[in-house]
């Protein structure tokens, strides 16, 4: 496992260097590629590194590298442009205003003395919420041409198929990838959380009756199910707007894989959300 972890670290460091280089050149599109190629596997990468090296400090460096990339991209956009940030003419949409209000509420609840959590912990919690706003902000100001968009769609399709195949393999062999990678021990050492449930992972990995829920290469079944909502939206859009019957058949098969993946992850909230997405898409 140490060989796999070493190769993974080398590839990741090289990829981060490439992404940061492109970001400093002013191309925020590569931040989106970073999200697509790393975040779905982020928790699994941490498990592999921990199992390979057994070093908590190394895992923490890896974990916070994501924050470094996002905040660096944000600062480059704010201060690295020839045109001053203040000189921009902002035309806010309803979604922009909702996001701005959401981030403002987060900032207020971080600063006011509410709750028992210490101020440092509140800042750490708020950081993850601010990352959502940063990604939205950068995406809002990134121009993506048709060629790049087609590549993004291909990556999303590969993630859909890949996650289904992983979950199907877990189902067939009656195991969890996280169990193979010692998720229980990782959670105990890194987060001081003891393993729970019938599979030595956490209760998130099973539903009522002790039946397993699978996460594929995502961190847990809930994250897997949430990602399926994005895959569902992509499949529905191209199914309804494709001009060719062969393409429609392919996207119909993709939606079938998404449906089966919902069964593997079994998140009732995500299943209800998928029904809402289908309803508003069709009507």
Region annotations inferred by a language model:
Residues 6-17, 41-42, 59-80, 126-134, ...:
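Membrane-embedded alpha-helical segments of multi-pass membrane proteins
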Residues 29-50, 55-133:
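N-terminal hydrophobic segments of proteins, predominantly signal-anchor/transmembrane helices
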Residues 20-30, 79-98, 235-253:
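Membrane-interface helix-loop-helix junctions at transmembrane boundaries of multi-pass membrane enzymes
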Residues 103-111, 134, 150-177, 188-266, ...:
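Alpha-helical transmembrane segments of multi-pass inner-membrane proteins
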Residues 3-14, 65, 101-104, 108, ...:
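Alpha-helical hydrophobic membrane-insertion segments
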Residues 1-31, 38-39:
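N-terminal alpha-helical transmembrane segments of multi-pass membrane transport
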Residues 13-24, 37, 72-87, 109-172:
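Transmembrane alpha-helical segments and their membrane-water interfaces
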Residues 24, 55-61, 91-94, 113-122, ...:
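Membrane-interfacial loop-to-transmembrane-helix junctions in polytopic alpha-helical membrane proteins
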